[in-house]
Amino acid sequence: MLVCIPDVLSRHEVAEFRHVMDAADWEDGRSTAGAQSAMVKRNEQLPPDGELARALGRRIIQALTANPKFVSAAVPLQIFPPLFNRYAAAGNHHFGIHVDNAVRGDPLTGLRIRTDLSVTLFLSEPDEYDGGELVIEDTYGSHEIKLPAGDCVLYPSTSLHMVTPVTRGARVASFFWLQSMIRDAHARSMIYDLDGAIQALVERLGRDDPETVKLTGIYHNLIRYWAEV
């Protein structure tokens, strides 16, 4: 399941992020890659243990956990501290085809998560750079993702994916992973679809409609059945 979520950050918030990020010191992005990924990764990152990355990351997590669409799609249990990268044309930056590590550990907090879902939050407008598409492969083919600044995409961490070479400008983004309460991707997808159907019925019939209440109960009972907390 691939889900795009608009307006996670406002234009003003994106401008605040970029103001401090553009003035920051960046390092080689291979420092956070696994052995195989490091062979095909060429980009820059904010130091992941730096106060700037941590502070901006906390703001992103706060925005996402208040976003109903994100919570519905992810059913998050643990969210890894967001990281930040930059792909610049001047550095011939790109990230070849790879799959994310199954488990991620944060050395500062000791947090370890199973990576069920990957998230990319775009912090550059599409017209600021050429190339730099996030290409995600699944059973239905390849999907090229290039979203407005402030929007994010949520996709299974099991997916092969890549970032195409940036040929003009710079692509700035945040990226991270999460562990869902619902391990099984098919179950999680059904929960997301069911929640969407319930919300549509609420709009038409109201929260007190008996059938809406019954479906809401089924939703919570399925969460109870599948959740690992």
Curated annotation (Swiss-Prot):
Cofactor: binding comment: Binds 1 Fe(2+) ion per subunit.
Domain of life: Bacteria
Cofactor: Fe(2+); L-ascorbate
One Pfam family from the record: PKHD_C
Residues annotated to bind Fe cation: H98, D100, H161
Keyword Iron in record: yes
UniProt keyword Magnesium present: no
GO BP, one annotated term: DNA damage response
Entry EC no(s): 1.14.11.-
Top enzyme class: oxidoreductase
Keywords: Dioxygenase, Iron, Metal-binding, Oxidoreductase, Vitamin C
GO molecular function: 2-oxoglutarate-dependent dioxygenase activity; iron ion binding; L-ascorbic acid binding
Xref: InterPro entries: Oxoglu/Fe-dep_dioxygenase_dom (IPR005123), PKHD_C (IPR041097), PKHD_hydroxylase (IPR023550), Pro_4_hyd_alph (IPR006620), Pro_4_hyd_alph_FE2OG_OXY (IPR044862)
SMART domains: P4Hc
List of residues binding 2-oxoglutarate: R171
Domain annotation Fe2OG dioxygenase: ranges: 78-180
PANTHER family: PKHD-TYPE HYDROXYLASE YBIX (PTHR41536:SF1)
Full protein name: PKHD-type hydroxylase RPB_2089
Annotated organism of origin: Rhodopseudomonas palustris (strain HaA2)
